[in-house]
Amino acid sequence: MEEEILYKIILVGESGVGKSSILVRFTDNTFSQHFAPTLGVDFNVKTIRNKETGQTVKLQLWDTAGQERFKSITQTFYRGSHGVIVVYDVTDPKSFERCKNWVEDINQYTQDGMIIILVGNKSDMVAQRKVTFEQGQEMAEQLKTKFLEVSAKENNGVTQVFDLLVQDIEATMKNSKVAQNQLNLNSEVGQKRGCC
């Protein structure tokens, strides 16, 4: 029986950018035009198969409120998380600019090397678009994150966000295990060199 892998993933961003829509599209493959704003934090679980390793991975998905009054709740959920998806609305430049603040918070409340993906949602709203794909890429480079655009409504790119996140988390975990094993080997060698 294979070992169960569990990753905690958090979705953050301003209110109304479509975090809940992305989550529900990914977990239930449905879309609703009208969502009540998330109050505090919402939680969901989805089991997927890693496309590279074939291993089963359980994702614990936390959808956080975008309102300022819930910010302290959101910060507590960063702890113990493996990855964060920062969502903005491509029709709302203010939500895009606030991504810098979200990433600063993530960096402040998590350990170094947190996997972060910047996601521009509502890419289907071409006529209302105010933030270009290139601006999203540029912001991601500045913030040192990965970047994707999605449409939760049309189910474009949503699964790719989670696939990319899982691949990056696993690569980071593998590298840290290699580093940890190297550390353990070095300490064993150091112990064996001692006298008597």
From Swiss-Prot:
InterPro entries (alphabetical): P-loop_NTPase (IPR027417), Rab (IPR050227), Small_GTP-bd (IPR005225), Small_GTPase (IPR001806)
The lipid of kind S-geranylgeranyl cysteine is covalently joined to C195, C196
Q: Which GO terms describe its biological process?
A: intracellular protein transport
Q: What is its main location?
A: membrane
Coiled-coil regions listed: none
Where along this sequence does the record place binding of GTP? 13-20, 63-67, 121-124
Q: Which SUPFAM superfamilies match?
A: P-loop containing nucleoside triphosphate hydrolases
Ranges annotated as spanning the membrane: none
- SMART domains (UniProt xref): RAB (SM00175), RAN (SM00176), RAS (SM00173), RHO (SM00174)
Q: Which GO terms describe its cellular component?
A: endomembrane system; lipid droplet; pathogen-containing vacuole; plasma membrane
> Any idea which GO molecular function terms this record carries?
GTP binding; GTPase activity
Which membrane topology describes this protein?
Lipid-anchor
Where in or outside the cell is it found? Cell membrane
Keywords in alphabetical order, please.
Answer: Cell membrane, GTP-binding, Lipoprotein, Membrane, Nucleotide-binding, Prenylation
- Which parts of the sequence form the motif Effector region? 35-43
Q: Which family does it belong to?
A: Belongs to the small GTPase superfamily. Rab family.
Specify the protein name.
Ras-related protein RabC
